[in-house]
Amino acid sequence: MMARRTVDFKKLIEQLRARATDKAEALNTVSQLEIGAVDAQDVTASAVRAFVGALPSSGYHFGFVRQNVVFYLLSHATVQTARDPLYAAEQLHEQLDRFLRHQHDGGGDEDRLPFYHNGATLTAFQKLLQTLREIQTVIAEQSGGTAAAADLIASNNASTERRGKKGGSSSGGQQPLVRRVITQLETAATEARPYVNCRAVAELLDLTYQRLIYWACTLMPYVLFRRDTDTELDTVLLMHFFYTHYRSVNGDLAVEFQNYVKNSVRHMSSFVSSDIDGDQKPGAEHMRDVSYKLFVGNLQARDASGLMFPIISTRISTVNLYLSPERMFFHPGLISRLLSEEVSPRANLDAYARVCDRVLEDHLHTPRRVQRLLDLTQMVMRLVELGFNHDTCAAYAQMALIQPASQKSSLFVSEIREKLIQIIYNFYTFFMCLYVYSPTFLFDHRRRLILEQHRSTLIGSKEELQHVWSNVTLNVNTHFAVQYTEEDFEAHTKGATEAEREYLYRDLHSKWGVHLFTLRPSRGAAGAASPLPPLDGVTRSDILRECALVNLNEGRVNYASLLAFSHHPEFPSIFAQLVVVTEFSEIFGIPQGLFQAVGSPRLFALIQLCRVLLPEQVTLYQNLVSIYNLTTFVKHIDAAVFKTVRDCVFDIATTLEHLSGVPVTPNVDLLAELMARSVAHNLYTTVNPLIEDVMRSSAGSLRNYLRHTRLCFGLARGRARLSEDGVTVYVEVQGQYGLRVPTTRFVEQLRELVRRDRLLAENLRGLNERLLSVRVRVRQISSDTEEVSRHAKGHRTVAQMSKALKKTASKIKMLETRVTLALEQAQRSNGAVVTAVQRALAVFDVLSRENLERRGAQLCLTEATSLLHRHRALAPMTWPAGTGVAAAAEADGALREFLEAPWESAPQPPRLRMTPDTDHEESTAGATSVPEVLGARYEPAHLAASDLLNWYIVPVSQAQQDILSSIDPPAGSTSVSLPPASP
């Protein structure tokens, strides 16, 4: 269970009163507040008076705290624990104001510290609260739809209508109100700049910025983004996008979509696939929702039936005809195809390549430094116009994540894929940062965690994508350039003493971390107020003796005896070697289960020692504070948290080696346990979704392929015989069942079998790639543990975790191998059946009417005979001897269903009576000279000899000549007339 970050303010005051005469103990006490925080709801006027009265009158930074207590409490108070942070801040202001009204001395020196004295700080805080209350009221009214907000929006909408309905990222609707509120907030943040590092101020700005950004990003009406040049497919995808993600301002789209589909349904049939397995085609799973809503003509419908329906096509050849290239990112199925490289190198991808190049050039290759929130919101509108928001970017990032790093595709296709990944990863991290943005140190921490965590997730060990992440990092730091500069610090601390500057800088360093500037002594600063006693006759032996007596087991710091030695030249080296290294190693050897109770207090005591006795080692202090906060107050140890702790530990080891002059090997017991929690969290949050995606996207294809394999097995077990007249096919299934199928239907079903085999093979191509991506992700997680493993050879937890990861990767590899082998065996056996079917179909194709007319009967019959001879020369197909009865029965049932079920009531081909009248009718009607092989058949009439009079009767030689000339006409001739009947 994580500890509370806030300290008990009343208890802290009591501790100060009890130790008022001991400045070192007083420093320990206030350090609890400075490293943690005080709950703003616990701060009252009387408590503030008691706090000031309990502080020592001199020493360290106590004088600054007593004179500028309003700034000090705002710097270390938190409002995040309150249900309504802004109300809690207003109550805090009221209590601080009450405290100042009863003070005889306003506190602080207005001339020396114009920004930090109590009166100026409280006035600035009050002004900020008033502005934030106004902004949050507007946002709440907008969200709640009050009358005042409605009137304002109506006036804005009216002005927008006068400008027309042309789409794009032009302002309109509620955008003027958004711009006004953003300007108001940015002005308030600029005026509060001297206090932006106060925790209470930073939290309020952080909360308001995030609420404003979220509100502004939901105001995306479809009317602003549609174009007159949009195709039917463009319109359907855009309506679905804006209704799904921005329904609050697009409620009327439901009716508009219904009417549009009703009036354009004929055109829309061109870009949907009605194949029975259309939802199993590459990328189709991402089009299922919009396809269902298009199918029923209702944006509010949800697919809960499990039925089949037409799916919007993801084929490049089809999409090219019906989708505008600049709308490509509204089509997730297309993006999935391009990312998986499920496209032919011959496909026309030039238009999409140009769109990618334009997006990269406009937004990513030469990013402009963003100075205002308004610039960010305008960029959001441009990205929405392209089809990007947080949800779509997350979906596209997941698509890219499950694809293997390299595939056997043409260079052009691979280049498009790499451009897509660069675009997606950039915009994904942009939206991740945007929704937690504020110009404060709180966002600076989040930005670093986002970059660290998503670098591990999205890039990992993929060397070919490292340059992509370098571009992502550059763009994030450019778009969200949040920092507190040395110029700001010098301007705000003008007139402060060195002790005050040191306290303020250390506080900044604990909040901003290593990205902060390095403090330089101020020329005009007043003298330091350090409580160090004089250094008289101190020897190395004295330092060694005092350092050997330090013991932090009780979690208390008693460094009064060491203060006299801290300015000795050899003190940092001896103190680091005998105290810090030892304590550092012992603390990180405490099991995690005991760390809250035992390790955390000792770590806090070590922080205090380093703060007082090694004041110049600010980085060491900051790393210790970071570890303390992350191990004490953070609940979920993910990859970013673990890597931060790990990096801090090894940075501390490097610093201590430099100070002590001896090698330092950190104890990794605690790191190993944190690593185990991080790995478990990573497996749950990154590998599990990949496995679920494999199951979701491939389950249908596997089921269909299993049915297809059973059918092919049934065909291999069966025998087919053509009737004498060629009209019917008789199928025997191991002599047990007899099927009678019209030849035309039989041929059609065989063609369907060949087509389905090709489609299913295409659908299953990505299964192995997805399984490979799971294994690659596990390998990336393993690589995150390598640095700890190098320092912990033989460590039990590390060894167990490495073994578990290897076992997981091995099982995934084994599953991948089993699936691959099973599919290869099935494809091999299915391929043999399909090849045999294709040979049979080749005979029918050779004897088709078109072929006979074009090439003549003699050549076609010769080729067909050759095909039959080659087919008969092949060995008959067999099946494994151990095939079970149940499997054989399932295969036979699949064959019966395949051949019989769809055609139970199918009509037989028409029969023509062979009479003089019908023959004459066929000739006079201009019928083609060569009928279909599987078409209508003559039915010989049983006529008497007298009925044959006046019909075609010639000598045998003449008949032979006429027959041959009619079925193999001379070149240029299309028909042969029968000679007149002889009497």
UniProtKB/Swiss-Prot annotation:
This is Inner tegument protein. Its main location: virion. Residues 902-932 are annotated as: Disordered. Interacts (via C-terminus) with the large tegument protein/LTP (via N-terminus). Keywords: Host cytoplasm, Host Golgi apparatus, Host nucleus, Virion, Virion tegument. The keyword Lipid biosynthesis does not apply. GO terms for biological process: virion assembly. Belongs to the herpesviridae inner tegument protein family. It is found in: Virion tegument; Host cytoplasm; Host nucleus; Host Golgi apparatus, Host trans-Golgi network. It comes from the Viruses. Residues 914-923 have a biased composition (Basic and acidic residues). Plays an essential role in cytoplasmic secondary envelopment during viral egress. Interacts with the capsid via the large tegument protein/LTP and participates in its transport to the host trans-Golgi network (TGN) where secondary envelopment occurs. Modulates tegumentation and capsid accumulation at the viral assembly complex. The keyword Flavoprotein does not apply. It comes from Human cytomegalovirus (strain Merlin) (HHV-5). GO terms for cellular component: host cell Golgi apparatus; host cell nucleus; host cell viral assembly compartment; viral tegument. Residues 474-983 are annotated as: Interaction with large tegument protein. The gene is UL47. InterPro entries: Herpes_U30, HSV_ITP.
